[in-house]
Amino acid sequence: MNVVNMVINCRVLESDDVPSYRDIRLESLKLHPEAYGSNYDTERKKSELFFENQIKNQSSENLMIGAFHHSMLVGLCGLITIENDQFSIVQMYVKSAYKGQGIGQALLSKAKSLLLQYQRSGLVLTVYEHNKQALNSYIQAGFQETSRRENEIVMQFVHRP
């Protein structure tokens, strides 16, 4: 979908968003199994996915940000609290038809804006080194490489007030 000036709204998902979250999460696992630590067949059989529970209970430790085009959920960015009062970014995904529209950057921008609200010092993520599009997107968003392990690059964004 190539729409000029597409209006995207990013926000933390709420209970009413759980069915849409499940659909897009399973889609991400089915279409891009190489990008995630979970797999489609295992996850689709679960009665409740990890983040479904977190969303329903409005956890302040683990958040799922959604990107919406009108009322349709088109992107995800999960945040899990880790040591040193940081969020780890997980389950980053944008629907294929919406790639290249700045939605990933909008999700990362929303994640950065939540650092102050949830009193976190930074964001950490891992990206497969072969995923050049994601890697470039993270660099553009201000993330810096901190280390490498196997075929993954560990990156960090530190909030500076």
Question: Over which residues does each language-model region extend?
Answer:
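Extreme N-terminal starter segment of soluble prokaryotic enzymes
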Residues: 7-10
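Conserved acetyl-CoA-binding loop-helix of GNAT-fold acetyltransferases
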Residues: 94, 100-113, 136-140
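C-terminal "cap" of GNAT-fold acetyltransferases
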Residues: 121-135, 139-161
